[in-house]
Swiss-Prot record:
Protein name per UniProt: Leucyl/phenylalanyl-tRNA--protein transferase
Keywords: Acyltransferase, Cytoplasm, Transferase
Chief place of localization: cytoplasm
GO biological process, one term: protein catabolic process
Localisation per UniProt entry: Cytoplasm
Catalysed transformations (reactions): N-terminal L-lysyl-[protein] + L-leucyl-tRNA(Leu) = N-terminal L-leucyl-L-lysyl-[protein] + tRNA(Leu) + H(+); N-terminal L-arginyl-[protein] + L-leucyl-tRNA(Leu) = N-terminal L-leucyl-L-arginyl-[protein] + tRNA(Leu) + H(+); L-phenylalanyl-tRNA(Phe) + an N-terminal L-alpha-aminoacyl-[protein] = an N-terminal L-phenylalanyl-L-alpha-aminoacyl-[protein] + tRNA(Phe)
Amino acid sequence: MRIVKLSPHSLAFPSPEGALRDPNGLLAIGGDLTAPRLLAAYERGIFPWFSPGEAILWWSPDPRAVLFPAERHISRSLKRFLRSNPFRVTLNHDFAAVIAACADRPEEGTWIGPEVQRAYLHLHRLGFAHSIEVWQGDELVGGMYGVAQGALFCGESMFSRTTNASKCALMTFCRHFAAYGGELIDCQVLNAHTATLGAKEIPRRQFLQQLSQLQRKPLAPECWAPQVLPPQQVEPPSPTN
């Protein structure tokens, strides 16, 4: 297996099955972040991840981390927190602010550089990339963004400036996405944060099969219209005797 150098004259990508095992999922190098190339990548289960100033790297890891909205997990402590309804959650109200906040996370390093921000903001303006914002009063305290592929949503990054804000973003989006027929959220690589919310790993081949099926299921345009999302509904605790 070897890393493929992308041609500047073609949007073709190599098969994800040819990706390296170490580092896991590295598939190709080069190309650009134009909208046609980014969309061609997402359609094939491939995403960019690289450091600013360095060559663009393209990835398709195996296994793949995913979250089925119907299987989302809300812990007891998070349920208690959400019952107080401390946040207002919106969709596509301020994409630029969300991706800038994701780039500003120290623990994320600096991979979401200016070039990446410009590219995804362009995708947003074209109607392919979307943001979820979490507000406390008028302050943006959390959120996430990603790229829609029919009934599959490719989550790219999230941030939180106060307790549980990013969890609230993901859980509220799960319910909204499922209500419009969304079936799967791509989390790319499993981490402790998404695992606590119900994300799990599946083989890359299974992910690619689901991607092929779900990207042919377009959701109603109303799903992505700028809007305020209803508060996450959490059942009250069962009464004790």
